[in-house]
Amino acid sequence: MEILEALDATRDETLLYFELGESELAATYGPGKWSVRFLLHHLADSEAVFNERIRKVLCEGRRVLWVYDQDAYARGLDYATMPLSLSRGIYAAMRASLRYLAAGHYERHGHLEWVHSETGVRTLKQEFDKSASHNEHHLAQIRTALGQPPRRR
């Protein structure tokens, strides 16, 4: 399944970046933008949010699910001092869960709908796809911060 390949590819690349040194983790992709460290923490939190949304739709049916404030997470969890090892563990576990859920539910239950508090009606399939594309979007930012060329997938 294409979604599983996308989830695996973005996972494998993301996990490599958790091993960077302090100077690379402090790099940003532009003035006033998040550092690689912040992006990695954000990816872990986003994986948890994607997981919660998908599980709620599978278990509780159509409902309104609220947007999460990524800047509030960065401040409230203090991304600057939060151990990156914690976020690595969260990211790896949440991605394993997402992959498991996608393997069993992407085709069979991908049509199930829910309502995003800002963007409206979405399907489970769209949320799985969003998790992979969101990860890829931030990987592109990390590559830019590190001076790496864009990847062609």
Residue ranges with predicted function:
Residues 6-10, 15-20, 74-112, 129:
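Acidic/histidine-rich alpha-helical segments that form the ligand environment
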Residues 1-4:
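N-terminal export signals and maturation junctions of secreted/periplasmic proteins
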Residues 24-70, 109-153:
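Short, contiguous alpha-helical
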